[in-house]
Amino acid sequence: MTSCILAGSLETTPKVSPGDPEAKPLIFTFVPTLRRLPTHIQLADTSKFLVKIPEEPTDKSPETVNRFEYSDHMTFSSESKQERVQRILDYPSEVSGRNSQQKEFNTKEPQGMQKGDLFKAEYVFIVDSDGEDEATCRQGEQGPPGGPGNIATRPKSLAISSSLASDVVRPKVRGADLKTSSHPEIPHGIAPQQKHGLLISPTTSEQLAHKPPAFSFVSPTNQKTPPVPANVSGATVLREFHTRRLDVTGASEEETTTYFHSTAHDSPLSAWKGASTLVVSPSAQLSGSSLCGSNVTDHTRGLASEAQKKMSTSNVLNPKEDVRTCPAPASGASLTSPSASYIPVRIVMHSLSPSPKPLTSSSHGSLSTVCSQMSSSGSLSKSGLKSPVPSRLSLLTAILKSNPSHQRPLSPASCPTFSLNSLASSTLALDQKVKQTPPTSKKSLSSGSLTTGSTEQEHQASAASYQPCHLPFFSKTTPLSQAQPLSPLALASNSCASMDIEKIPGSTLRSNTTSPQPQTDTFSLADVPSVTPVLSPLSSSKGRKDGDSRTPEKNRNICIQPSTLASTPPVDESLALSSSGKGFHPSPALSDLIDRSKRACSQQHPGQRPSPSALPTPPVSRAASASHPHLGCSILPLQSSLTQTLQPSPSALRPSCGSATCPSRTQMPENTASNHSSRVSTPSLPVSLTRTKELFSPCALSMSAGPENKKPKQYKTMSSYKAFAAIPTNTLLLEQKALDEPARTESNSKASVLDLPVEFCFPAQLRQQTEELCATIDKVLQDSLSMHSSDSPSRPPQTMLGSETIKTPTTHPRAAGRETKYANLSSSSSTASESQLTKPGVIRPVPVKSKLLLRKDEEVYEPNPFSKYLEDNSGLFSEQDMAIPHKPVSLHPLYQSKLYPPAKSLLHPQTLSHADCLTPGSFSHLSSFSVRDEQEKSPTLLSQDTYNKLGHPMVTIPEHDTLDSKE
């Protein structure tokens, strides 16, 4: 299914995007957003961003394949097998339908956008992986089946979105889609929506903030996204279609189309998730693709759920609990405002920088900005406001301007700094405005803030508004928690955690002073499963939202903790970065932003801190208990989320997941949280570590390459792919730098001690694998060369014996040529083995040449063999010539008068050895003529001399034979 999705997304995305994925030109197309869905649903489709940098179509396919596998795995674990099967079954038709639908929707969507007067702006995002594309494809695929009613209206847009999302989602949706997965029903809609919904208004800002980081986080989300698609089938309403053009290289284009079709066509999760995803999307996207997924998902659950449930007069907690316990209640709630919350958003992320890490950096920083922008733009698009168009353009301009900064810095921090600081403020303002302005459902859907839930929404709204800035840090966490959502409870937990995270980031951004509480939450939550960051935001969000319903919160935490365990590394990254700068290798700017968000969170949720702490403790214990159930039901999700975590943020995630989850995080969190964390994280660590290892080779590498756009993992994956693909050394060196840099950053961080080994293991493992592969190649080359060399020498004698002199001379030159080739190969292999093993992508012909000379000397075939053959041939010729004068003398007049003899000689050599004689045949004419003419005078000597000079005595022999046979 994954591969199919990938193919479909790839096919669909090119159709959707004006530029061929192979075409590198950046295409900025401003298309009015389709604010209205084909039917009752509002379609704010910035999803038609066709900015594609198909720099890495080839890389994309391997990475995408891996991502598909991984996302498929994630989907399998998080979404029920039924959902996955449904998604698989639906996908083929979905993809084909989408391809046609995407075209139609592209046609319609531009019209709708034109009608809506909103610009569908193509934003250049730094996208590392096209896994998102596949994930989005799945989302789109599931979305249509999941929400037939809304999908019926939205299928075309969904098809386009899903195709784009599929491309984008793999890399970007790794985080975002996985987050979406946390919203099983919205997965397609939400993860993409979160990206796109967040990106609708903050499309530009998201690109600013979302470019690298969003995708990095999205990569984790991607893992969740596969699970989400299953839910999306239920909650197809919110569809985010991410199209990543150049995932693998990291300079990939990400097209995200988010259709927030919040109709209750699917489970409550889908509906309210869709709506809340849109709402959360802005902030989630702000937070990052990964966080976007989980934050938006959680936010969506909390805020969108609240907004929708508000609209549907349902408690946010109920939606959350419903989401967590059963999507059906959520769907009922979401049904209330699905149409309003339906916002198709497509953001085409352009990965201008080739390395995934820049994408990661940009994503983190830009995510918050995108979130705010998404909030404003999304709310505008949802509200039907046309005024945001200029703001969107300005945002796009800002993104384009800021893209350089995101792309330039390889470290996530620089990108986050720009988007978090500059875009965060502007985006936050936009988000706040949007949150205030748009309808509740639209607000919740479009706004990053969760304004729909009155109290919670206010908190979330403020958190969401600020969340955009902070989310980038949490975005990493969220993808994992959304990976957890594979199971409904995990989904609910992840949603809650995402919401909390989003809120916390928002509050953090809002107030930088209260870093302790977020830190406490973060650490305690981090302790719990290494999901602490997610849990802590979740705790604060729940403390605010679900203070009364802490049991559901605990359940959510439980669910989250599995996912958080998976997603904790990212969250811990951001939190550790802010608090201790341990896990997050983003630059200081990112850590500052994280600190800010933590402060804001603590300020925003001063009273919630105890609640998060307390919640983390029960959630942790529950996480241990529920985590284990989830391990059963969502172990794969957890594993995938952990894999996502480890892969997306190799430094931070791995530290959090692999080493810091239990020890460092346990130490950091409160004692109770740490105790629970040790409990939960211990089981979850086995899951995360074991699963990470298990998934690492198949999924982790792909995940690292595509999902988390983090340089270390992606570079590892990329380096492995590229090394196998014989990619130039400087690229490998750059990748190695990218891999080493995160490790250094992590080593500086507190959790780095534990994290570094995990992270280093990946580069080391990759190196080992590459070395082993190179050694194997060398062995094969040597063996084949040795075989060839032995065969080639043996062949000449055989030819000599078989064709006597005729074949031998011709074969020997040929054999010599072949031997030369083999000698080059063997020499290269032998020289490589002797001096240095073959290095991936490095081919050294020089030693091969030297070996050729050596082989020639050893075999002496070329100089001596010719002379020997010539001498032998001359002897034969002399004998034959002795006979020839008699026979040929009669024929000699014919030779002189006609060219038949040469022709005959050619014919005869053909009989003897067509290929061998043909080559000398041309000479044979000359030799036959000269020889025969000379033969009259002194046949033997002249014939010998002629043959030696021409080097084709064989020809004469065939001629004589031909004459004999003819005579």
Curated annotation (Swiss-Prot):
Predominantly expressed in the heart and skeletal muscle, but detected at lower levels in the lung and brain (at protein level). Also detected in smooth muscle, thymus and kidney. In brain, expressed by a subpopulation of cells within the hippocampus and cortex. In heart, expressed by cardiomyocytes. Expression is reduced in hypertrophic hearts at the transcript level. However, expression in hypertrophic hearts induced by transverse aortic constriction do not differ from control at the protein level. It comes from the Eukaryota. Induction: Up-regulated by beta-catenin/CTNNB1 in mesenchymal stem cells (at protein level). This up-regulation may proceed through the down-regulation of UBE3C ubiquitin ligase by CTNNB1. It holds the Pfam family MLIP. Signal peptide: none annotated. May be ubiquitinated by UBE3C ubiquitin ligase; ubiquitination is followed by protein degradation. Residues 132-154, 302-336, 432-462, 506-628, 644-685, 786-838, 929-967 are annotated as: Disordered. Keywords: Cell membrane, Cytoplasm, DNA-binding, Membrane, Nucleus, Phosphoprotein, Ubl conjugation. Required for myoblast differentiation into myotubes, possibly acting as a transcriptional regulator of the myogenic program. Required for cardiac adaptation to stress through integrated regulation of the AKT/mTOR pathways and FOXO1. Regulates cardiac homeostasis and plays a role in the protection against cardiac hypertrophy. Binds chromatin. May act as a transcriptional cofactor for ISL1, repressing its transcriptional activity. May also repress MYOCD transcriptional activity. InterPro entries: MLIP. GO terms for molecular function: DNA binding; lamin binding; transcription corepressor activity. It comes from Mus musculus. It is a peripheral membrane protein. Directly interacts with LMNA. Interacts with ISL1 (via N-terminal domain); the interaction represses ISL1 transactivator activity. Interactions of ISL1 with MLIP1 and GCN5/KAT2A may be mutually exclusive. The modification Phosphoserine is found at S129, S792. This is Muscular LMNA-interacting protein. GO terms for biological process: negative regulation of cardiac muscle hypertrophy; negative regulation of cardiac muscle hypertrophy in response to stress; negative regulation of transcription by RNA polymerase II; transcription by RNA polymerase II. Disruption phenotype: Knockout animals are obtained at the expected Mendelian ratio. They are viable and exhibit normal cardiac function despite myocardial metabolic abnormalities and cardiac-specific overactivation of AKT/mTOR pathways. In aged mutants, cardiac function is depressed with increased left ventricular dimension. They show an impaired capacity to adapt to stress such as hypertrophy induced by isoproterenol (ISO). Residues 508-523, 558-567, 658-685, 800-811, 938-947 have a biased composition (Polar residues). Residues 437-455, 528-541, 826-835 have a biased composition (Low complexity). Residues 543-556, 958-967 have a biased composition (Basic and acidic residues). Residues 144-811 are annotated as: Required for interaction with ISL1. One of its GO terms (cellular component) is cytosol. It is found in: Nucleus; Nucleus envelope; Nucleus, PML body; Cytoplasm, Cytosol.
